[in-house]
Amino acid sequence: MAAATAEPLAVAVAVAHTATAGTDHSPAPLPPPPPHCNYKSKLQEYLQQANKQLPIYCTKCKGEHHQLKFKSTVMVDGEEFSSTFCHRRVKDAEQDAAKVAYDTLLERKETETDDTDVFELIDQDVVFSKSILHEYTTKTKTDQPEYSVTKTEGSVTPYVSSVSFAGHTYTGGAARNKKDAEQKAARAAVKSLLATNYTSMAKIVRSKEKLIRAISPSGYNKGIDSNPTNKKLPFAPIKFTPPSIFKLYDGEIDMLSVPQALFAPLVAAEEPKVRPAAEPASNPSEQAVHVSKKHKDNKVRGPEVKEERVAQ
């Protein structure tokens, strides 16, 4: 009887041991290393372009000495970003943290809500407003805008345009011609869409940044935009100051204006008075008489000189 009860007991113990062996909890495998991409270099380059401080990494160790796990945290501009998983190597943990920081900063830059730069680009120039609105309608698959222009007589800026788009009508400022009036109406629509659908419209505006920056120094429509009340600008005549030239009179310097100098009589420089020499006679007979007189004078004067020497 005892042998009969011992056999089923041994079978039960064996079954229980097998069940407990099957439910043994082994450590979960670690995640694979991150893909081969140097996110640390990308993050550092991004921060250098943004004129920010370089990232600082801090890695912590977990687990037993024979099975260590590393989790890294990177500090960027006072903000911390931690790695998603624990890794077997410190290098992989830092790359994971750099990837989290890099992806977060890029996404934040694309969806940032800083309206100042976008509105400044729109206000700088209106020449690309119609193209921006047209590109927006193409991407959102909506109907193209329709423009209407009205003219007011007796005004420096007689044209005013309105644009109908997506069930709304937007009116721009006054302009000197129809083309500028339509651009201003499109700019009013773009500003309104920035308030309601900022993300998609802001991307389109920023894509035109280089073109707007390049054309803005030309002063396109700046005179009209600076006078939104449509008042007459004050007229200020330009005064020209004629240049001066210098004239010398007997060692003194006088300053004359250009008109006076042009019509002033010219002053000739005084030449020294020199007694002109006697011109020789043109007649050959007269020249012969003149030579004979010289010989006679020499003959007469010769004895007188000798007499004076004898008297001495």
UniProtKB/Swiss-Prot annotation:
Oxidoreductase found in the keyword field: no
Name of the molecule in the record: Double-stranded RNA-binding protein 4
One GO-annotated biological process of the protein: regulation of gene expression
Domain DRBM residues, every copy: 38-107, 128-195
GO MF entry, a single one: ribonuclease III activity
Keyword field contains DNA damage: no
Region annotation Disordered: where it falls in the sequence: 273-312
Organism: Oryza sativa subsp. japonica
Keyword terms of this UniProt record: Repeat, RNA-binding
Record's function text: Binds double-stranded RNA.
Compositionally skewed regions (Basic and acidic residues) per UniProt: 299-312
Taxonomic superkingdom: Eukaryota
